[in-house]
Curated annotation (Swiss-Prot):
Role: Acts as a secondary carrier for acetate, propionate and pyruvate. Has high affinity for acetate and propionate and lower affinity for pyruvate. Driven by the electrochemical proton potential.
UniProt xrefs under Pfam families: SSF
Cellular component terms per the entry's GO annotation: plasma membrane
Gene that encodes it: mctC
Keyword Membrane on entry: yes
Claim: Transport is one of the keywords in the record: yes
Upregulation: Transcriptionally regulated by RamA and RamB.
GO terms assigned for molecular function: acetate transmembrane transporter activity; symporter activity
Family that this chain belongs to: Belongs to the sodium:solute symporter (SSF) (TC 2.A.21) family.
GO biological process: plasma membrane acetate transport
The entry's keywords: Cell membrane, Membrane, Symport, Transmembrane, Transmembrane helix, Transport
Protein name as catalogued: Monocarboxylic acid transporter
Ranges annotated as spanning the membrane: 18-38, 63-83, 90-110, 144-164, 171-191, 203-223, 267-287, 307-327, 355-375, 411-431, 432-452, 463-483, 503-523
Highest taxon, organism lineage: Bacteria
Length: 551
């Protein structure tokens, strides 16, 4: 992603809002949500409670929680900022994130809920050899989770830097550390049940807050969408930003400003689109939400509710993005601490002053906390349930032991994400999440689809698909311009970029599918026809799925 949506290296203070008011709203929100977590998360000693909340949520509740889990800092901060600077090309993120839900609904939501219990690996290993598949699946889960966590931590750093007018790197790092610590506390104290309620609260606040901002944006420009778009073009035309970049301001209304200049950028767009559209169906923290409802019917209802909320949200990001372009302007956005990631809070300030900015920013902060808590639960399940219980203890560990290992994992993964999030604070969060989607679509999706729909698929194919997708995606990201080779890279002073695309999906996703196919053909059959037949029946009917426990 080019420098237009990266943090300005010599950012100029925007000086908006009231830092004391902002931090006060944050503290109140943390106290309220922590109280909710403590009240609903008292019973988390058993693995069923800790990982899935006892599968006791209704479809409507879970739909709210899915929306809360999915609508991350990238969705709010990153996309609004990307649209404000790149126009239509920034909106491509909204389109990709939303279309991805149709893939998840059509291909994986119901069969995954019917076959699995706690984690993605439950499905992948159902008719294959447990240990190698669970280890591979856990590696894929942890890699995707870490990438996603890094994005949320970076978003938190950018957000609070704007709100508290913090410019020094060390204090921004402290902010990221505090977010990580609060996230760890949410998960340790509340498990999946506490985390789910936080996500439900956050979904209502976020969609409601964005709806209010959308209405106020139209009121502020005194017209409809056409007026808004014309104002955005005029603001770009008068900006130093457009003059420096050398583009026609009307380009913000059409495709190609960011991804249409060369063959490489066009291929990068295709790669990004593939990653976004296929990534959701392989995101472990989203897939895990299907296990928190008692039946497949409720799982389908969950996804329906989620699609309605998520679709409405992404339509409104179009208005907010162009609203930020028209009312704030690209010069002020790029000069703020956080650059593109600061566009939404700056727009809130223009619409309603310091108090409204504090409230919207608290919602954005809630977005970060809710998503990182869900990610931490997923990582803890991968280690506690898949590796410790199934591999190390051969399925003989007690539920209390699994939960203890999972809680230790939450602390470790939280600390790692804090460190990596600090290093990635200069990156646009939508771009970082797109990398997580690419890893998910490469490492997880091929194996999930093969497991559910190809009877001959075997352990060799599963392991080959996961590791090929995971390693190729990570290696190509490391060798891409996103990490080195230009001023906007993660390591701006170095240059080892030999892969031209910033997103690896175009190469790594097909590689994983091919590896799974070849591995199945050359590997030995698992001779588990009975389990394959049982899996097919369960995936279609839900027979044998664990019922919700009574709470």
């Amino acid at each position: 992603m080019n420098s237009t949506i990266l943090l300005a290296q010599d950012a100029v203070s925007e000086g908006v809002g009231n830092p004391i008011l902002n931090i006060s709203v944050f503290v109140v929100f943390i106290i309220v949500t922590m109280t909710v977590v403590l009240r609903v998360g008292k019973s988390t000693s058993e693995s069923t409670d800790f990982y899935t909340g006892g599968a006791s949520f209704s479809g409507t509740q879970n739909g709210l929680a899915i929306a809360g889990d999915y609508l991350s800092a990238a969705s709010f901060l990153g996309i609004v900022g990307a649209i404000s600077l790149n126009g239509y090309d920034g909106f491509l993120y909204s389109i990709g994130f939303f279309v991805a839900w149709l893939v998840a609904l059509l291909l994986v939501a119901e069969p995954l809920r019917n076959v699995g219990r706690f984690t993605m690996a439950d499905v992948l290993s159902f008719r294959l050899r447990q240990k190698p598949v669970r280890v591979a699946a856990a590696c894929g889960t942890l890699a995707v989770t870490l990438f996603y966590l890094i994005a949320q931590m970076a978003g938190a750093g950018s957000l609070v830097s704007v709100l508290l007018d913090i410019h020094e790197f060390k204090w921004q790092a402290v902010v990221v550390g505090i977010v990580g610590i609060v996230m760890i506390a949410y998960v340790l104290l509340g498990g999946m049940k506490g985390t789910t309620y936080v996500q439900m609260i956050k979904a209502v606040l976020l969609v409601g807050g964005v709806a209010i901002m959308t209405v106020l944006t139209f009121v502020k420009v005194s017209g409809g969408l056409t007026t808004l778009l014309n104002d955005a073009v005029e603001k770009h035309a008068a900006s130093d930003y457009a003059a420096t970049k050398g583009y026609d301001p009307t380009q913000i209304l059409e495709p190609g400003l960011q991804y249409g200049a060369t063959l490489t950028t066009q291929l990068d767009f295709i790669s990004l689109a593939l990653a976004l559209c296929l990534g959701t169906a392989g995101l472990p923290h989203v897939l895990m939400r299907f296990y928190t409802v008692p039946t497949a019917k409720e799982a389908r209802k969950s996804v329906t509710w989620a699609i309605v909320l998520i679709g409405a949200f992404y339509l409104m990001t179009l208005v907010l993005g162009y609203g930020a372009a028209a009312l704030v302007g690209p010069d002020r956005v790029i000069a703020a601490p956080g650059a593109a990631n600061a566009a939404a809070p700056l727009l809130a300030f223009e619409l309603g002053g310091s108090i409204f900015m504090a409230l919207i920013s608290a919602v954005a902060f809630a977005t970060v906390l809710a998503v990182v808590a869900g990610l931490a639960i997923t990582a803890s399940a991968a280690v506690g349930h898949d590796i410790y219980n199934a591999v190390i203890r051969n399925g003989q560990s007690t539920e209390a032991e699994q939960v203890r290992v999972s809680r230790i994992t939450v602390v470790v993964i939280g600390l790692i994400s804090i460190v990596l999030g600090i290093l990635a604070m200069t990156q646009n969060v939508a771009f970082l999440v797109a990398l997580a989607f690419a890893v998910a679509a490469s490492a997880n999706l091929p194996t999930i689809l093969y497991s559910l729909y190809w009877k001959k698929f075997n352990t060799t194919g599963a392991v080959a698909a996961i590791y090929t997708g995971l390693i190729s995606a990570l290696l190509l990201i490391f060798l891409s311009p996103a990490v080195s080779g230009n001023d906007s890279a993660m390591v701006p002073g170095a240059d080892w970029a030999i892969f031209p695309l910033k997103n690896p999906g175009l190469v790594s996703i097909p590689l994983a599918f091919i590896a799974g196919w070849i591995g199945t053909l050359v590997g030995k059959p698992d001779n588990m026809d009975d389990l394959a037949a049982e899996m097919e029946v369960r995936s279609l009917t839900g027979v044998g799925v664990e019922k919700a426990v009574d709470h």
